[in-house]
Amino acid sequence: MSEQFEHISVLLHESVDGLAIKPDGIYIDGTFGRGGHSRLILSHLGENGRLYGIDRDPQAIAEAQTIDDPRFSIIHGPFSGMAQYMEERDLIGRVDGVLLDLGVSSPQLDDAERGFSFMRDGPLDMRMDPTSGISAAEWLAEAEADDIAWVLKEFGEERFAKRIARGIVEHRENPDKKPLTRTKELAALISDVSPFRDKHKHPATRSFQAIRIYINSELDEIETALNGAVKVLAPQGRLSVISFHSLEDRMVKRFIRKNSKGPEVPAGFPLTEDQIKALGSADLKMASKAIKPSKDELGDNKRARSSVLRLAERL
């Protein structure tokens, strides 16, 4: 059994304050994790309030089951299923706030057995839900060099993607080499084939991020979850999203911007005002500028340094 690891919720108060919680409201914590955000949300709710937590990590589900509160329910599944879960509960268009804390959590990173970190030796797994899908080791044992390079470039913005992919495949095809099954083995290989050293960043940082994102379909999950949030939110309901790297943040920023605009009609196009309105209207409005951690929080938690909070309101 994995040991317990501390998790410090990033932008905790800012993200929960951004929900503008109503005591009798209905809320979703789409990334329960170890429950930091959920517990704070519950502290703001009255006896008629309701909170649904969602997570696909069995360890998160075990933690959620320690919360003995009739206002709280946990759902085991990906947050991309948010709209479906709420439809099953007849809550489409009735939710007052959705919080998403994207990416991998500190306990997942710190637990070597999960295989997320190049800093700790463990099985090369990287699955958010270890009970489903293929592991990173299984994928790397089969994927073509071009496919590996594409993943490293697309999801890690890795400048040496082709060189690293070629190194992985050459290692795999060498009969004198053991298959890559451990995080330290992959990290060492990447270090060996990378020609450039950044004193502030391990050579494997971007590759591990990219492989993790691919294995868990993270960006597709985020896109589906954001669309699901728009569907489940009531008018004036709040969306609070914390991201940790530029790919996530760009996606969230573009989503809010896109859904804050009405239909684009070319200038001079022969439509009446009523016809334009019939095409639809904006779904969201930005509720705040991007929020970053305070100096105090950065001093207490170095993992907060890349985090960004974006808030939107349902129209």
From Swiss-Prot:
Which BP terms in the Gene Ontology apply to this protein?
rRNA base methylation
InterPro entries assigned to the protein according to its UniProt record, in alphabetical order: RsmH, SAM-dep_MeTrfase_MraW_recog, SAM-dependent_MTases_sf
GO cellular component annotations of the record:
cytoplasm
**Enzyme class, first EC level, given as a word:** transferase
Q: Which NCBIfam families match?
A: 16S rRNA (cytosine(1402)-N(4))-methyltransferase RsmH (TIGR00006)
HAMAP family on file: 16SrRNA_methyltr_H
Stated name of the protein: Ribosomal RNA small subunit methyltransferase H
